[in-house]
């Protein structure tokens, strides 16, 4: 049969256990996002169970499905990183052997001076910080002085937080574009992130108008090849930001995981050849980093409910792949991402059920498989598993 469309859904930060080199990335060898959320009574994911989530190599918790509807694998990250950018690039075919720069002690003095000159404003904070805590600790000073809150994390990011009443959102976006130009060469961070917030001290709240300005991928991804070949490449959520707009033919903004799945379900009613690439960031942003086990579990439960709406609406020729880009164990130390294996489940008419693909050694196996499904030649270090799962 002819396969015409792939829905690739990334559950941002849904790791399933520590990778062998987790210690090199500052993580304990016990980190396990799935295991942590399974301690919550808010978790109820029968549809993912039926697809084979608990049958995946290394997943020791949860009841195995005797007859899984999907084929499945555990994916190990080949790239040197544990962040959104590196993870998504690898899913799309690019393995990063060199880690992107990080700033555990804050940004160098010369960089701060360049940013201040470009913005015409002073900078405060300049250290790794939790996004919610930083606006609590520096928001009042920002509102009194107009100085911008610039901070980072364990990831390769420069984040700029500003109150919408002090810096209009469009102006904040312009500052981020300027920062993207300045953060080049050895300082080419993966993402510049606009972090607008509202409210009064001490009850500041971040708004959904976050915007990411990513470094462009260093080579062609499967998205580029699909688009050049005339296929539609639809991004839902922050995919467009992660790839700096490269290889995207249509972008759909979302406000939440739930909104993202509603948009994905709506795409099932459209008719096109290509890829619909979905990122659901709430797992990471709202629950993983905030170490909110119950919140993470409840979000997975809601995703699973919507997955139950999605699956029966799939058409002949549609393929669904569910995966993740890294971990963010809500019971882990600190507030940052965790270096973890991720799940992969592939489902659709014409795809074998219950094939256990074991542990595979690159997220790029997904890109290699997408290239085979869509019959687009693409050179990547990933290895396709299409022959093993197609009927």
PLM region descriptions:
Residues 1-391:
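Feature captures the catalytic ectodomains and active-site-proximal regions of enzymes
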């Amino acid at each position: 049969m002819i396969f015409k469309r792939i829905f690739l859904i990334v559950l941002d930060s849904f790791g399933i256990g520590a990778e062998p080199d987790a210690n090199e990335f500052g993580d304990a060898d016990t980190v396990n996002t799935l295991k942590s959320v399974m301690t919550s009574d808010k978790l109820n994911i029968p549809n993912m169970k039926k697809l084979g989530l608990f049958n995946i190599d290394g997943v020791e918790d949860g009841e195995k499905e005797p007859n899984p509807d999907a084929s499945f694998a555990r994916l190990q990250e080949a790239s040197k990183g544990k962040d959104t950018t590196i993870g998504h690039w690898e899913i799309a075919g690019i393995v990063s052997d060199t880690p992107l720069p990080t700033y555990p002690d804050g940004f160098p003095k010369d960089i701060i001076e360049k940013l201040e000159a470009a913005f015409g404003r002073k900078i405060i904070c300049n250290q790794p910080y939790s996004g919610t805590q930083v606006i609590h600790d520096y928001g009042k000073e920002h509102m009194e002085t107009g100085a911008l809150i610039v901070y980072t994390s364990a990831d390769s990011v420069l984040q700029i937080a500003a109150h919408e009443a002090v810096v209009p959102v469009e102006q904040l976006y312009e500052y981020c574009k300027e920062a993207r130009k300045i953060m080049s060469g050895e300082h080419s961070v993966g993402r510049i992130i606009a972090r607008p917030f509202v409210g009064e001290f001490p009850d500041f709240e971040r708004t959904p108008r976050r915007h990411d300005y990513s470094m462009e991928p260093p080579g062609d991804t499967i998205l580029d090849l699909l688009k050049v070949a005339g296929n539609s490449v639809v991004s839902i959520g922050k995919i467009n930001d992660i790839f700096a707009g490269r290889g995207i033919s249509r972008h759909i903004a979302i406000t939440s995981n739930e909104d993202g799945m509603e948009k994905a379900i709506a795409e099932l009613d459209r008719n096109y050849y290509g890829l619909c690439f979905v990122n659901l960031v709430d797992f990471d942003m709202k629950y993983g980093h905030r170490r909110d086990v119950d919140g993470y579990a409840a979000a997975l439960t809601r995703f699973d409910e919507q997955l139950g709406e999605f699956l029966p609406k799939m058409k002949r020729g549609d393929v669904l792949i569910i995966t993740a880009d890294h971990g963010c164990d809500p019971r882990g130390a600190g507030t940052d991402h965790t270096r973890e294996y991720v799940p992969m489940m592939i489902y659709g008419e014409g795809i074998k059920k219950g094939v256990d693909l074991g542990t595979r050694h690159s997220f790029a196996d997904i890109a290699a498989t997408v290239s085979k499904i869509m019959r687009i030649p693409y050179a990547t270090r990933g290895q396709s598993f299409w022959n093993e799962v197609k009927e």
